[in-house]
């Protein structure tokens, strides 16, 4: 699958629709897309998706659906009805769940990209050990990614540290969306496995997710432009 349009996804990690729209108005939909996650969507609902779409932005609805197959299928279909560009599910929900999500989109002429989440970038080996998983983050990512591809997903969310291996294992057309991306001048925050935008793209990331380095910048538009220029 070829990558078209902006590769930068700005994480709109707000709890108020007005704060989201104030920032969106400073950004250029020709340079970036917007990621709307659980906190903002729970607070503002579909209205926030519609509002930023009216400003010209593609939306990645980052709700990481993980439930029984029928419930996830209904949620993915609802997201598609909103006209989102991308939506995601947890690969750990299993093959039947992911296949149900894919099948829910069959009748849509303009389907959103359907992406599976592998291992959250906040998790390292000690976190996995704590929930009874002894394999490395890299091994778990590879296993879940193979299951996601088998289930008909368009790609995965993974650390940029695994993006290159993902392309080798799953093929160049299998999309990689990588959070935990921070310019070298910023702190890592709560993301443990982080790389810079340039490193991420060089390592095989198709789309990079950046939050606070843009949303909390003194000049968000300039911060966004700097990242875009660094990956072109």
UniProtKB/Swiss-Prot annotation:
Coiled-coil stretches: none
PROSITE patterns: OMPDECASE
Keyword Transmembrane: no
GO biological process: 'de novo' pyrimidine nucleobase biosynthetic process; 'de novo' UMP biosynthetic process
GO cellular component: cytosol
Family named by the database record: Belongs to the OMP decarboxylase family. Type 1 subfamily.
Name this polypeptide is given: Orotidine 5'-phosphate decarboxylase
Species for this entry: Teredinibacter turnerae (strain ATCC 39867 / T7901)
Gene: pyrF
């Amino acid at each position: 699958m070829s990558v078209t349009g902006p590769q930068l996804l700005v994480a709109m990690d707000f709890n108020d629709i007005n704060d989201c729209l104030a920032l969106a108005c400073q950004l250029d939909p020709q340079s970036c897309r917007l990621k709307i996650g659980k906190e903002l969507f729970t607070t503002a609902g579909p209205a926030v998706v519609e509002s930023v779409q009216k400003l010209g932005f593609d939306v990645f609805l980052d709700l990481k659906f993980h439930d029984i197959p029928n419930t996830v299928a209904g949620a993915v279909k609802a997201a598609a009805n909103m006209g989102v560009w991308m939506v995601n599910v947890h690969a750990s929900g299993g093959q039947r769940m992911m296949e149900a999500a894919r099948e829910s989109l069959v009748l849509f002429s303009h389907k959103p990209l359907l992406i599976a989440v592998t291992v959250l970038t906040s998790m390292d080996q000690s976190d996995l050990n704590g929930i009874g998983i002894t394999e490395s983050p890299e091994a778990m990512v590879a296993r879940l990614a193979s299951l996601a591809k088998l289930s008909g997903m368009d790609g995965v969310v993974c650390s940029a540290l695994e993006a290159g291996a993902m392309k080798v294992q799953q093929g160049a057309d299998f999309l990689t969306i990588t959070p935990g991306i921070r310019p070298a001048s910023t702190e890592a925050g709560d993301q443990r496995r982080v790389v810079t935008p340039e490193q991420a793209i060089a390592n095989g990331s198709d789309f990079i997710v950046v939050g606070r380095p843009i949303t909390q910048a003194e000049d968000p538009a300039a911060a966004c432009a700097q990242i875009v220029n660094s990956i072109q």
